[in-house]
Amino acid sequence: MSTEAALLKLQSWFSPSFPVGGYTYSHGLEYGVECGLIHHRESLQTWLEGLLQWGAGHGEGVLFHGAYGAAVRQDWAALHEVTVWAQALRPTAELALESRGQGRAFLVAVQQGWPHPWVQRWGDGLAEHAPYGVVTGLACAAHGVPEAMGLSALLHGMVAGWISAAVRLIPLGQQAGVLVQSALEGEIQTLVRALLSQPASAFQAELGGCAWMAEWCSLKHETQYTRLFRS
């Protein structure tokens, strides 16, 4: 696939207008703002750096890498294994809902707009348990999108969604959100290089996280009195 063709797909799939419902999730940021942990641009940037290094950014990136490699090898048993690990390691119910809900919606949209037998084969069996990182990795592999480009687009889109939620919640000005997005580009590139330096077949070695406060905020969000977001 040409670079231009891959770029067009990624701009569609990870656009804010792509129908995965990303705007309905805050990944626990809503409670983090409520209790004062996230209250200005600097605290938001630090929080999101942590999510990339030790939280969902790293976790979904590992799943993307494992799924991409399994799909390229057409090893459907390995792809199933990645999915099972993804389901088992979700720290909270709402974070599981966030990944599964977006993954299912992404799968449906890609099947409709960019049908491919690999995506169809996997989607028919596991559509109800479709982690976001897994289905995006599968779609990129199926359509010949270079892995580094696809993984970078996934992480950039996740960060953009978190920033969008925080801009509305804190609230922050749009310019502050732009500054955070720009500042995190280096973190995204570092994470992509680190993940792709490991063999995809050994993805289990990279699984895990240490974003305890983000997970605590997700747990507290379940019983938060006033909520704008689903997570």
Swiss-Prot record:
Organism: Magnetococcus marinus (strain ATCC BAA-1437 / JCM 17883 / MC-1)
Record carries keyword Nucleotide-binding: no
A Pfam short name: UreF
Keywords, sorted A to Z: Chaperone, Cytoplasm, Nickel insertion
Compartment list: Cytoplasm
MF (Gene Ontology): nickel cation binding
GO cellular component labels: cytoplasm
Subunit text: UreD, UreF and UreG form a complex that acts as a GTP-hydrolysis-dependent molecular chaperone, activating the urease apoprotein by helping to assemble the nickel containing metallocenter of UreC. The UreE protein probably delivers the nickel.
Designated gene of the protein: ureF
Family: Belongs to the UreF family.
Function: Required for maturation of urease via the functional incorporation of the urease nickel metallocenter.
Protein name according to UniProt: Urease accessory protein UreF
